[in-house]
Amino acid sequence: MYATLIAVALVWGGATGLLLPRAAYRLSVEPEDTWRDSCPAGHPIIGPARGWLGGARCATCDAAVPSRTAGSLGGDTATPDTATPDTATPDTGTPDTGSQQAPVTDAPSVLVPLITALACAALAAATGPRPELAVWLLLAPFAVLLALVDRNVHRLPDQLTLPLAAAAAVLLGPAALLPGAGGSWPTALLGGLVLGGCYFVLFLINPNGMGFGDVKLALSLGVVLGWYGWLVLFVGAFAGFLLGSLYGLGLMLLRRAGRKSAIPFGPFMITGALLGLVLGGLAAA
């Protein structure tokens, strides 16, 4: 049964991952813009779900669209401070133009469904046939989409962060009522408030180093991590900071960025939360 469950999750992740690149392209815009309506050649974006689902390729001119905004990311050779990396991911307003941004290269489109499939399979393997697995599998593609957008343009749009937090809080309620649930809904809600509050304090202390989009993302990650208890919440949150620091250290060693370089922190927050959920699922089993 576990093998079948993992296989289904793997297929689900791969299938949904194939639909993410176009949405990531459309949402990878500057804060003053809502989303893209056309390809780089100017053709209207069409396709399933009003042009939101599918590969990053224009159906009219058959040209592949870039996975990040041209010119939005610089290629400086400075490195972030790995002790407290500059992780600002603004979601509204004007980006921090005083800090340089670390270079980012386009990820091959095959990586998106692969990463989504592996994430879903890992969640299925750790969680097993418990009701919360359905919630994890529904939320995982949107988390990957957020990571893609943040990686592309260093921002976490409200169109994704706020619905994700609401969905996590609402969907875990019915899951807690079903037999075999491995977590606590009240603790999940408190976890969202606590982690979101901690990130908000960090934002107030250093708004140039912590974007308000990170605060909103922390709400949803706190909910899912809090489902398995406070220890899992701490481990998942700490793992995000650790991964971000290691990434900054790698850039420093490679001389590809500087202390004032901004790095997208959302992908590390999400990866840390994934690790926390895997550990929490295994512990609950």
Predicted regions and their residues:
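Extended interfacial segments that mediate partner engagement and assembly in macromolecular machines
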Residues: 2-28, 43-187, 195
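Soluble N-terminal domains of membrane-associated systems
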Residues: 36, 40-43
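Interfacial loop-to-transmembrane junctions
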Residues: 216, 249-275
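Functional transmembrane core segments of multi-pass inner-membrane proteins
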Residues: 141, 145-247, 285
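Transmembrane helix-loop junctions in multipass membrane proteins, especially transporters and channels
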Residues: 25-34, 125-129, 177-181, 207-208, ...
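Juxtamembrane boundary at the C-terminal end of a transmembrane helix
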Residues: 277-285
